[in-house]
Every structure is written in structure tokens, then in C-alpha cells.
């Protein structure tokens, strides 16, 4: 009986996506805000930069760095309201390491030199706080990715900034030292790593019983790159063995969707727990890395590309949903069992960029068009917000076209937000903003795919909102609620300048307005670099 129901749902979903894609690509349904329809891939001719806007982004980066240097260096994270710091990322100077590749791309030789010298003085074998759990995921994407990216850039396109070869070579040395210590995380019965490790006083795993697909499915790019740079295949083998559990998932659940695997996996045997799937926290960057590994080496990682295609197609079939009050918008919901819940997040807005990137690599127009549609819809969340910035989490009521959105998942907004929902098509469930990049990131991919300068204008709108709402005397800070304007005297801040503000948000803004270069995404899919989930460019294998 369950199989029959599942087949029926899949069949209904196929009808839905056929209608949805047809209306998106061909029907020309009237839309607000000038949304694109039937977008054509641009030739790989150079796209125009905007020097004045690019300079403004550089100024924001330097302001952020100056405040970090003044109040927080060499510690991890600046607290811009209280003008102090915290060591929330192991005490190794997360903001500096994470911001290094951006400083290199902006060709700020002074900041690059300062960070290289700070890294030289950093001991990556101990944490500042004893018994502090280290996140394998966060340490890989921020530190390992940052070190390897800087090494790649300073060894190639930006070698003129590497005035001291000893400092440059120390980047790879530090990455090796760090990865060797982190490797204990993979010492589990299944080879799926524990996401938490203790470095000191004794090196050991923390002892978690499961891990999310984001936390261990977003390691393979950095660990494979480290193997390619060193010739030591141990690092790649560890990460790829873990990844195999996701490429060939094991589950006891009666209902799953093709390509959209669950979220949590047992370290003991590699089996998935309850079926939860989507592009939100816990899942997002696993899907992102499938297509990025294909970009890194389309032959060696062809199976990763095939897995991404399945996930992308299922996302279009079973997760795509339009709000009841804004049928012109399309978001991706989350699966809970056999029901699609119409909820999404700032993290999930990366889905548009991933579909565009996959479409460019595969030269598949349908993926590009759907990715652009998602990117535009998620940016509309920004435009409708009183602050001009999108919230951490939001929800909507499905318009009835998604078969997996059952009546039980329908939840109306609170009365005070009903009029806002009528206009915007969403209502927030967590109104915070912590300087995240994903919506701007997807606009960047939309611009690189289409050459349409409206995406530059939208990114500039977002930057103006960030300057207006988040810039304070001590740096850039998060917001407790994007539903409050600058003039609202009750507005409050999240007192933290996350390292990804320098690594990702400002980098994507800069790349949006920078002149064409070999770092930029190309519409023909022939890229020299692939950006990790922290926006650190890594040299594609064989380039």
C-alpha cells in the first residue's frame, strides 16, 4: 500500500513539475518586479564590471578589517557593538584566515601580508580553550579552505602579492598540520566522521553518534585539493570514503525521493534516521558540493554530478512551491516524511546559485532558468522586508499546486503579519540576520549566467541595505530583526561580525562588480577555479 501511495505521489509530482516548468519557460505568466523568463545562456564574452561600486565594496572590506584589527586581532571574531572579541572558532584567528582570499582578490597587499604573518604565529595543534570541541565542518571550510585557497592564489594568478615565499609556503604547511590533527574524526566504524574533535589536552573524538550530511558531505573538495597539492592521497581517501555513504545512501525508511537523501546519518553503520530532506541547514552544502566536485574534475567525479542531477530534478519536482498570495514566486520547501513543509531559510537561498552553476557546467538551460527563478524569488524576500534584508527563517502557505504540500502543513501567519503576507508571500519565523551571503551569492550566479545588469543593481540595493542597517562604529553587526527599520528605536543587534562576512558576503559583492577575470564564473562552464562553500577559490584539477 505504501509503495502504491508513493508511486501516486511521484506521478502527481511529475505532472506538477511539467506544468510548473512549462509555465516558467514558455507561458510568460505576468510577474512583478521584472522577473526573467526563458533566459538564454550568455556567450563567454567578458561581462562589464562597475569600478565605482567595486571600490565601495573594497572600502567596506577594509573598514571591517580595520575594526577587527583594532578590537579583535589575533582572535577569532569581532564583537562590533561591545568592541571586543571572542574565540568561538578554536582561537586561530578565524576572521583573518577566512578573509585572506578576499584580501588577495582585492589585491590589498598590506592586509595580505598582515594575515600571512598572523598565520605564521598560529599554533593549529591546540585550541585556546582546553577541551573546546572543534567542528570538523567549520574548521574545514573556513580554515583548511582558506589556507589552501590562499596558497593556490598566491602560487598562480596573484603570485605578485607573495613577496615572501616562506610565508606563502607556510599556508600549505599549516593546512597539512591541521588536517593531520583533524583526521582522527574519521576513526569510526563506518568512516563517517564525528563532527567534533578535542585537540587538547588530549587528542580525541568528542563521541557523537550521528552527523549531518552538511557536516560530513562538505569536506571532500578541500580534502581532495590537499591531496592533490601534497601527493598524499590519505586526505582524499578519508573524505571520499565518507562521501560514498551519501552517494550510495542506506535507509530503512519506506519513503524517500530520488537524489534527496535524509539529513542525519549514524556513525556506527551509515544508516539514515528519519526522512528529512531539503536545502536548509544540515543539508544545503552537501548538494552544493556534488556539482562543485564535478566542476573540480568532471571525469573522476562524474557520479557526483549524476547525484546532483537527481537532487536538482527532485527539488524542482517535489520541493518547489509558490505562496498562495504570490504565485509569481517560487521557493524550495523541506521534506518531513512524505510531506513537503512550506518553510525555507536564508541558507536555502543558495539553491538558486547551485542550479545555475549546474546548468552552466552541464549546459542545461532548464536548470539555469529554474535557478534564476529561485534566485529572483529569494531576493524578493529582501525587497519586501522593511529593512531591505531577508530573515533567517520564513514560511508561506502553498498555493495548491505542489502535491506533497498536504493540508496538515498549512499554517497561516499570525494576524499581525497577515497584511504583510498578502503583499510579500512569506512571513518570518526567525527574523534574525547574521551577515549571511547566500541570497547575494545566487544573484552573482544569475548575473554571470545571463549578463543581465539588473542583478548588479539588486546586489547594490542589498549592499546599501547592509550599510544602512548593519554598519556601526565598531564594524558590521547582525540584526535581531530584519522587520525593523533603522529609525525603529526598539531595534536590536546580534553582536557579532561573522568571519563569513569577509570571506563570502563581501567577496560575492566584489565579484559582482569586479572586472572579468579567470576567477569569475563563466557561462560556458569552463572555470579555472571552483569556490568552496565559504567562497574560497580552489584551483580546478589540471588547470
Q: Each predicted region: which residue ranges?
A:
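Glycan-recognition and catalytic cores of secretory/periplasmic carbohydrate-active enzymes
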Residues: 2-543
